[in-house]
């Protein structure tokens, strides 16, 4: 039986995960810091997972939508960066937090920023990914070399990130 984290109307498989959003270190830090839902290690990859029930359509040229889309992109980038910094502050001992007993960290992980959008068309994922890639600060890309993925609920289920609706 898998550990589950319920976020944005989806049930995420949370084996080998640190629920950073629910952690004491995050709760005690106060305003001004945003975080992803959780960090999951799967196949020596640190996945910083952000979940959304919906997201502005990247193909809608309406000015109001463009503003909402850019604002959403900015917030997601901020969450990825803040979460990476908060996680590393725990890793090097600046911030104190106790990881779950089953949270085992690889010695040489790679890094993925993963955005899962529940109600999102397949063809909308790529433009969101491209925009996130473009908006991540250059120094983050140079230092950490993260891969960015944007997937919907169907793809997340196929890739083993969420419990399939058929399995519920």
Regions found by a protein language model. Give the residues of each.
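Conserved catalytic cores of phosphodiester-cleaving nucleases, focusing on short active-site segments
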Residues: 38-40, 47-53
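Catalytic cores of nucleic-acid endonucleases
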Residues: 54-114, 138-143
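Polybasic (Lys/Arg-rich)
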Residues: 122-168
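Short acidic, S/G/P-rich loop/turn micro-motifs used as interaction or catalytic elements
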Residues: 54-57, 119-125
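Short, flexible loop/turn motifs enriched in small residues
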Residues: 32-33, 41-44
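Basic, amphipathic N-terminal segments that precede the first structured/catalytic domain
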Residues: 1-36, 165-168
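Structural motif
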Residues: 45-47, 112
């Amino acid at each position: 039986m898998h550990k589950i984290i319920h976020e944005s109307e989806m049930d995420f498989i949370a084996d080998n995960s640190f629920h950073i959003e629910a952690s004491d270190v995050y709760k005690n830090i106060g305003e001004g810091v945003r975080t992803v839902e959780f960090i999951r290690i799967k196949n020596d990859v640190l996945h910083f997972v952000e979940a959304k029930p919906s997201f502005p359509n990247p193909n809608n040229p309406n000015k109001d939508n463009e503003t909402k889309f850019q604002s959403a992109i900015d917030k997601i980038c901020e969450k990825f960066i803040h979460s990476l910094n908060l996680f590393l502050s725990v890793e090097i001992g600046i911030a104190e937090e106790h990881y779950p007993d089953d949270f085992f960290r690889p010695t040489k992980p790679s890094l993925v920023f993963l955005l899962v959008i529940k109600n999102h068309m397949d063809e909308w994922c790529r433009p969101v990914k491209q925009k996130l890639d473009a908006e991540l600060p250059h120094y983050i890309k140079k230092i950490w070399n993260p891969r960015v993925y944007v997937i919907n609920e169907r793809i997340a289920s196929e890739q083993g990130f969420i419990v399939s609706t058929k399995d519920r």
